[in-house]
Amino acid sequence: MKLAFIAYRDVLDDRVATSLDEIGIDFYTEWEEVKGKGHKTDAHLGNRPFPGYNTVRMIAFEKEELLEKLIFKINELNSIVEREDDKIRLFQLPLE
C-alpha cells in the first residue's frame, strides 16, 4: 500500500479533479488554501508579494496500478504546464 500527496496551484484544481475522475479515483482528503514554498519555486502565501495558494490531496492506494495511472496522468498534465513553478508535485510514502 502507498500513500500519495499531490500538491498543485489552486488554479489547476479543475484539471486535477477531472483527471482523478477519468482514472477512477473518487477517494481522497483535500486541503485548500495551503501556503508554502517548494525547492527552487516561488512561494504561494496568499498575499500581495506572494499571491495564490496551493491545494494538497492525500490519496491512499491499495493497488499500485492505480497509483501508476495517477503518476502517468500527472506527467501528462505537467507536459502542458508552461511554468516550472506551476507543475503538479507528487510525493509517495509506504502505508501500513
Each language-model region and where it sits:
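Positively charged, small/polar-rich N-terminal and surface patches that mediate targeting and assembly
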Residues: 1-96
